[in-house]
From Swiss-Prot:
Ranges that cross the membrane: none
Record's function text: Involved in degradation of fumonisin B1. Catalyzes the hydrolysis of fumonisin B1 (FB1) to aminopentol (HFB1).
PANTHER family: CARBOXYLESTERASE
Enzyme class: hydrolase
Entry keyword Hydrolase: yes
Catalytic activity as recorded in UniProt: fumonisin B1 + 2 H2O = 2 tricarballylate + (2S,3S,5R,10R,12S,14S,15R,16R)-2-amino-12,16-dimethylicosane-3,5,10,14,15-pentol + 2 H(+)
InterPro entries given in the database record: AB_hydrolase_fold (IPR029058), CarbesteraseB (IPR002018), Carboxylesterase_B_AS (IPR019826), Carboxylesterase_B_CS (IPR019819), Cholinesterase (IPR000997), Type-B_Carboxylest/Lipase (IPR050309)
Positions annotated as active site in the UniProt record: S240 (acyl-ester intermediate), E356 (charge relay system), H448 (charge relay system)
EC number(s) recorded for this UniProt protein: 3.1.1.87
Region (Disordered): 521-540
SUPFAM superfamilies cross-referenced by the UniProt entry: alpha/beta-Hydrolases
Descriptive protein name: Fumonisin B1 esterase
Annotated keywords: Hydrolase
């Protein structure tokens, strides 16, 4: 990815005060459907419509959507606006509204890195951003369809549930209810601060973005029957930071019963996490007066944070803004939890792309052997020589491939290997994949994020302009691959296995290391795409 059923009647009563109690205390073929809403760019507001045609009732009030082969409901609040005194607090219950809310337009995206919401159909950004969107097959009943909830990536610094390539229409046409949502990121989503920890009944702060995710999952549990979904058949799926968050939540007791299955696309697992005290020290860089910080303009606050808190990625150091070991949401490193079997033993589908790292390293000022060695020293210190032996570059021409492999393995592939080994050890159902894409003139090998338009079966103009894997436009081979890949994802959500009714047999990943490859050919085999780190682990 380029740097990247109920009609009429009375509304149900508002959610009780104990809502989210555990958290609040702290192109072409029919398979590829473009059904974007015309004019879906304005901010949604609560409105009394004269003649609502498609209405569903949530616990907070009625919502009007858009009718069609896929019924669409946009901009539904799953939590109260996290503004004012609710800034840097766990998400509070959504406020009830009178009349029928207009659910035909996207709500604002959360404030964050603007580059990460390129193409978004939302009208700008706002701190008031905790909204979700639903795509459901034309209603034939209530509460019987599997649900797929998408968690977008963005390095925990931004993103949007309203970009076109996350449109859920094509997947919904295959018989599932699709949900996307926004969550707080960056300084607004992950600030830890001593004053915030002091005011928390759990004595912690930070991880508000993760709590937003859990709140969205909880809203789905409480309301999705009204949109045709079954709250007992929920598959969460995400990419990059979204997948990383889901992997971390597998180890959190707060995620119990929040979802039934998970799909992790290029997760960044087995990375260091800051402790609460380390993160609180970062937070103090913004100032000691939390009341003043709550009154500050959110956009300006984000800019100040970016100038005062280093945001560059360090392989061996925790993210300056992202999930932390707070002792409440996250209580142990995922490495330790997976080793001990202290994770939710639910079916998981996980994988990555052939050239994960290049999406990041193409922009690095590392082009010569000397620059490469300096980069290794900066990242790994005394272990730089060991890492260079694992990822050698004997000439300047070797450097781009070496640094891309290093980045892809250390940031993505190694964690996937760790998760896979743990699931095999604890005999927990897991399926592995590797996305290679469709070769073509001007196309690079599939890198980070390139699988997304194929998973969503969205190969329209927005995806072509955004993803290098679609350079030159989507052809027949791309359409075929998107059909097969999206069918596998839906099969997993519907049947609990990714090959029910599909063309290719996809065996479970066990100790032999079976992996499904999605590319010019789709098929499974042993040891495909296994990270070089299995034979070369310089830190061991």
């Amino acid at each position: 990815m380029k740097e990247h059923q109920c009609r009429g009647g009375r509304a149900s009563p508002a959610a009780p005060a104990t809502w989210l109690a555990r958290i609040s205390v702290s192109r072409g073929a029919s398979a590829i459907a473009w059904t974007f809403m015309l004019g879906a760019t304005a901010i949604p507001v609560a409105a009394q419509t004269d003649d609502p045609k498609l209405v569903r009732h949530t616990q907070s009030g009625a919502v009007e959507g858009v009718e069609g082969d896929v019924e669409t409901f946009l901009g539904i609040p799953f939590a109260a606006p996290p503004v004012g005194d609710l800034r840097w607090r766990p998400p509070a219950p959504p406020r009830a509204w009178a009349g029928t809310r207009d659910g035909r337009r996207f709500a604002p995206d959360c404030i964050g890195n603007e580059r990460l919401r390129e193409g978004s159909r939302a009208a700008g950004t706002s701190e008031d951003c905790l909204y979700l969107n639903i795509w459901s097959p034309k209603q034939v009943g209530k509460g019987g369809l599997p649900v797929m909830i998408w968690v977008y990536g963005g390095g925990f610094s931004g993103g949007s549930g309203a970009v076109p390539y996350y449109d859920g229409s094509a997947l919904a046409q295959k018989g599932v209810v699709v949900v996307t949502f926004n969550y707080r990121a960056g300084i607004l989503g992950f600030l830890a601060h001593p004053a915030l920890s002091k005011e928390s009944p759990n004595g912690v702060s930070g991880n508000y973005g993760l709590l937003d995710m859990l709140a969205a999952f909880k809203w789905v549990q409480n309301n999705i029957r009204e949109f045709g979904g079954d709250p007992n058949r929920v598959t969460v799926f995400g990419e990059s930071a979204g997948a990383s968050a889901l992997g971390l939540l597998l180890t959190s007791p707060l995620s119990e019963s929040a979802f039934n299955q998970a799909i992790l696309q290029s997760p960044g697992l087995a990375r260091p996490l800051a402790t609460l005290s380390e993160s609180e020290a970062n937070g103090l860089e913004l100032g000691a007066d939390i009341s003043a910080l709550r009154r500050a303009d959110a956009g300006e606050l984000t800019k100040i944070a970016q100038s005062r808190i280093p945001m560059s990625r360090q392989f061996t150091k925790p993210r300056p803004m992202g999930p932390i070991l707070d002792g409440y949401v996250l209580r142990t490193l995922d490495v330790d939890a997976f080793a001990k079997g202290a994770f939710r033993k639910i079916p998981v589908l996980v994988g990555g792309n052939a050239d994960e790292g290049r999406a990041f390293t193409d922009r690095l000022p590392v082009k010569t052997v000397l620059e490469y060695r300096a980069y290794l020293t900066e990242q790994f210190g005394d272990e730089a020589d060991a890492w260079e032996r694992c990822y050698p570059a004997n000439s300047d021409a070797d450097v781009p491939a070496a640094v891309a492999r290093l980045f892809g393995d250390s940031q993505f592939n190694n964690g996937i290997e760790l998760l896979s080994a743990a699931f095999a050890k604890w005999r927990t159902p897991l399926w592995r994949y590797r996305f290679t894409g469709i070769p073509g003139a001007g196309r690079r090998p599939a890198t980070h994020g390139d699988e997304i338009p194929y998973v969503f079966a969205n190969l329209g103009p927005s995806s072509v302009s955004m993803f290098g894997s679609l350079e030159g436009g989507a052809g027949a081979s791309d359409i075929k691959l998107a059909t097969e890949m999206s069918a596998a994802w839906v099969s997993f959500a519907v049947h609990g296995v990714p090959d029910q009714g599909t063309k290719s047999h996809w065996p479970r990943f066990e100790r032999r290391g079976e992996i499904m490859t999605f590319g010019s050919q789709v098929g499974s085999g042993e040891g495909l795409g296994v990270s070089p780190s299995k034979a070369c682990q310089p830190s061991k």
